[in-house]
Amino acid sequence: GLQSNAGIKPFDFYIKKGEVNGFTGLLGSGRSECVRAIFGADRVIAGKLKKNGKEIRIHKPLDAMKQGIAYLPEDRKVDGIIGDLSVRDNIILAAQVLNGFFKPFSKAQAYKFADEYIKLLEIKTASADTPIKSLSGGNQQKVILGRWLLTHPEYLILDEPTRGIDVGTKIEIQKLVLKLASEGMSVTFISSETDEMLRTCSRLIVMRDRKVVGELNGDELTQVMIMNTIAGGDEKDGEK
């Protein structure tokens, strides 16, 4: 199993093309630490990562990005937005990192990319030059989402993407996730709201005390089953 330096127990994990799965569990159960290990944001100390059957090495986020993995972090204020930069510069940031800072996008390219995602995600902003800090929380979150979609990932990890945003934007993000999956993208979705997870995910990995204690899919995807697995999850350990 995969293990990082963030104190999570070794865990096995897979995701299929076009699938939306999720990590669920109480706050502090280790959900974020699992995806941070996959993205290289925390150091992996044991286990292997494979893509299409071949082992890949991810020591840092840039390695993950080069493998087509994108990660929208839990705290957009700390790890996501760069407040003083414009909406445009925030959108192109990850793609520019992948492209290399010695090969900057032209002004025309930058505007084209920004306008494309402002339109696609219906980001409410006066212009692409507006500082991102002046946007609402929901629109800031859409900008970060646009930033990662611009890298054209094969696998998108969303950690609490709808926390602290209005209901309308929440529904838009959920619909977008399902649309991306239908187009072949693999998505891991983490939310503290179990009803949101049940609406969005076709498979749930249940965690307790920094350990995977069960996996639910199909008819098992109910609030009751999630809570039962969190409460008495050890008995599902042997089913892996």
Predicted ranges, named:
Residues G1-K240:
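Glycine-rich phosphate-binding loops of nucleotide-dependent enzymes
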